[in-house]
Amino acid sequence: MTDVLPTTPTASGVTDRPLSEVDPEIAAVLDAELGRQRDTLEMIASENFAPRSVLEAQGSVLTNKYAEGYPGKRYYGGCEHVDVAEELARTRAKELFGAEHANVQPHSGASANAAAMHAFIRGGDGILGLELAHGGHLTHGMKINFSGRMYDVSSYGVDPQTFRVDMDVVRAVALESRPKLIIAGWSAYPRQLDFAAFRSIADEVGAHLMVDMAHFAGLVAAGLHPSPVPHAHVVTSTVHKTLAGPRSGLILTRQEFAKKIDSAVFPGQQGGPLMHVVAAKAVAFKVAGSEEFAERQRRTLEGAKIVAERLTAPDVAEAGVSVLTGGTDVHLVLVDLRDSKLDGQQAEDRLHEVGITVNRNAVPFDPRPPMVTSGLRIGTPALATRGFGAAEFTEVADVIALALKPEFDADALRARVAKLTAEFPLYPSAGSFA
């Protein structure tokens, strides 16, 4: 029989009852998910573990507050405390990335991209971005996405031999299509982009340059990846992934474009900001300015290079497995399975069987459908956050390599994964979040 909630608002009513009492089904979901995260190795490149401090801010009483507008210019009363939170988030973001202006209200990276486009171009204008099948993002011009429906899309791809972006090709496409906005950024590309070259091309064709640094923002914050801020007219990002903050968005720009960006976010794209998430962003930006965070990013890069090196070894190559571009400059490795007996779905399932979570991913010129694919995207941020160093990444890289070979011992590999999860407990003092 379903529990009946109290009908009168008393001190002992629903506002004071824990989740485990009010909704045991959802409490069970939280406990089960915490168990999954603790007992497996998370290697999806876009995922990370937010610090407990971020989780506390996001699950706070700021959830209750509406705050349409911006600090000091709200359309609601009672915003004096959330104004402080948003100012801290804006100031910390600007300092972290060396930007003149920051908007911390976007609900997601996609929202940030939509607002940035809305600020600089109009419906029907041309945009130029990395082709989705070659590592671009949905919001960079996919036909069924808002970006593909609203704008005239041209795309650049990667070289069929090197699988790298060729700036001469980008320039040629830009000169032919004359876009109003050029997008540099990616969702699945293992190398750094030349932001100065992108800006030069944008200037040549009279376009604005937008850089989507959602995946590598944490590396930029730590000084381990070139910053797009000096080159781009506008920079967008998520605050999770390598930044390990709440799932949300961020826009950085110059002071001359501040009003345009702010108006595009509110009221152009959104209503009230999620102030509990804004506060969590402020915490994440503070953490990202620490030496501990920089050290974690160094281990993230080191881990990705270790994984890439192991997956280029002769025994793995014999199984038809290769690494796109031969390595990585960032936090992820793209695995090409076109010559393997495994497709992307099968490889993902195999790693899941031994306790490693990755995602299947299309590779450039992929002959298989998107729900199957011929590749894997493997990332190291979450394991670096968990505390992994060179020795642990060497071990997990070997587990991955053995799991992708035709014959593998699932029980033995699962035991090796279990040993790693036990040695590096996740949220050890949390008990249950439910």
UniProtKB/Swiss-Prot annotation:
The modification N6-(pyridoxal phosphate)lysine is found at residue 241. (6S)-5,6,7,8-tetrahydrofolate binds at residues 132, 136-138. Its cofactor is pyridoxal 5'-phosphate. Pathway: One-carbon metabolism; tetrahydrofolate interconversion; Amino-acid biosynthesis; glycine biosynthesis; glycine from L-serine: step 1/1. Keywords: Amino-acid biosynthesis, Cytoplasm, One-carbon metabolism, Pyridoxal phosphate, Transferase. It catalyses: (6R)-5,10-methylene-5,6,7,8-tetrahydrofolate + glycine + H2O = (6S)-5,6,7,8-tetrahydrofolate + L-serine. The record marks 240 as: Plays an important role in substrate specificity. It holds the Pfam family SHMT. It is found in: Cytoplasm. One of its GO terms (molecular function) is pyridoxal phosphate binding. One of its GO terms (cellular component) is cytosol. The keyword Cytoplasm applies. It comes from the Bacteria. PROSITE patterns: SHMT. One of its GO terms (biological process) is glycine biosynthetic process from serine. Transmembrane segments: none annotated. PANTHER family: SERINE HYDROXYMETHYLTRANSFERASE (PTHR11680), SERINE HYDROXYMETHYLTRANSFERASE 1 (PTHR11680:SF35). Homodimer. Catalyzes the reversible interconversion of serine and glycine with tetrahydrofolate (THF) serving as the one-carbon carrier. This reaction serves as the major source of one-carbon groups required for the biosynthesis of purines, thymidylate, methionine, and other important biomolecules. Also exhibits THF-independent aldolase activity toward beta-hydroxyamino acids, producing glycine and aldehydes, via a retro-aldol mechanism. This is Serine hydroxymethyltransferase. The lineage of its organism: Bacteria, Bacillati, Actinomycetota, Actinomycetes, Kineosporiales.
